[in-house]
Amino acid sequence: MKNIYSPSFRSMSRGLALTLGLLLALLLSLPSYAQDGQSKVPINRTISGFTLGVTTPAEARAIIQRQGGKIIAEEGAQNGGDDGGYAFTGFKYARRPTSLITLHFYKGHPRKIAFVFDKLDVLEQIESELENKYGMMAEGKETSKMKSKVIFDAFTFLEVVRRFEYEGHVGFDHAYIAYTDAELDRARLAEKESEI
């Protein structure tokens, strides 16, 4: 049996205590993005030429035309309407074709941009690239016909959403990747709640 009062045992105990103390300090100093859902780097706010919270509807229209896109629906965006927006085609996201892009405005600036895909394998490739860049996404809202994953920073939410034809997540229908300006989204929600 070891004598716990011997000098060699005390130095070993001090070494163990020091090691455990350093390990605890290291764990406590882990960056906050070590948690799922919080981005390890700032999320890009300029996507396909549109900058969340900055680009005006007129600038957005010019970007769409300059890049060869075609506006297929427009609602209130030309007047800077609170919930105006464009739906357009002809753009790629991460070098992959999209079936539709929607750009939603609030107070005359982009609040959200969503890229719609009709192929699940394309979405999964992009999702993997996003997680490599920003970190592990957290499980988001889920219903019987929809699943989502999210990652965020102080200014931007990035969401990957899968929609299904049938309940129980059966029969892939389409998916989208959406970037949302956190401040504009909060302001819009507060305004909507005050109307109730």
Language-model features, listed with the residues they occupy:
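Sec/Tat signal peptide C-region and signal peptidase I cleavage site
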Residues: 30-34
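Generic cytosolic/nucleocytoplasmic N-terminal low-complexity/intrinsically disordered segments
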Residues: 1-2, 91, 132
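Non-cytosolic coordination micro-motifs
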Residues: 35-78, 112-196
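Bacterial N-terminal signal peptides
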Residues: 17-29
